[in-house]
Amino acid sequence: MSRHVALILLVSAGLLAPGTLASPQPVPKGHLVVVGGGGVPDVILKRAIELAGGPAAPIVVFPQASELADTGDVAVDMWRNAGATNVKWLPLTDAAAARQAVESAAFIWFPGGDQSKLMKAFEGTGVPEVISRRYRDGAVVGGTSAGAAVMSAIMLTGDADLQSITVGATKTAAGLGLWPEVIVDQHHLKRQRQSRLISLVLEHPTIVGVGIDERTAAIVSGPRFEIIGESSVLVIDARRAKIEPRAPGARAAARDITLHVLTAGMGMEIKN
């Protein structure tokens, strides 16, 4: 098991919080484009292409989160229609070829679907390690819906109680860990997912919850992110909250949780 994957699993298990590693982690030179699903507006597409280096920047797409056979082609068409001229989607049947393509990519993109399915497809390929290194070295990594959820180290799986704020009701798995300071939720307002993100933040109070609504993106550059798009992003911060100890299955309770509601043009910095 690689050190990268081992650290993600420790974070997911609650045994190691981001910011507590033995040696300081360098600030990534790249950017994340984290979209809440529901379509990707032109303003987000254009910004992503700009961050990647312009229309000729090489873009690779991993569509394995989706069960639809044409997801890769649809994503390629989306980026071409936005002005990109060098874009292709990658199968994982040849892991070495996929790793090589990522090595030369300026932008890596994940369409929607099921985030657990994508992470399962990556197992044993070595591709996540290359993506992580490319992000640290300056590449742009983006995704929408399920492709946004995988940015976290502690990744929402979709298995949750949306009707209550209950200890242990929101299930997680290990994500790519590209944005380990936060837990990303997607379709956040449109699908009324606030309860599951609050539940998870109270269980992992050292990590900030970022709920991104549809047709909206967080553009992450180092510790800072900014909002572009059409709707809102909710930031739920329990790092200084007074959390009541409760057993699994009980109603979660806390005081002094900080809530930020951000829209296009706004941003903030998250530091541990």
For the regions a protein language model found, what residue spans apply to each?
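Bacterial N-terminal signal peptides
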Residues: 6-18
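Positively charged n-region of N-terminal signal peptides that target proteins for export
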Residues: 1-4
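Class I SAM-dependent methyltransferase SAM-binding "motif I" and its flanking Rossmann-like core
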Residues: 21, 99, 111, 117-194
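Short internal beta-strands
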Residues: 58-64
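C-terminal and late-domain segments of enzyme folds
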Residues: 23-55, 66-74, 79-81, 156-157, ...
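Portal/gating segments that form or line small-molecule/metal binding sites
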Residues: 66-107, 112, 117
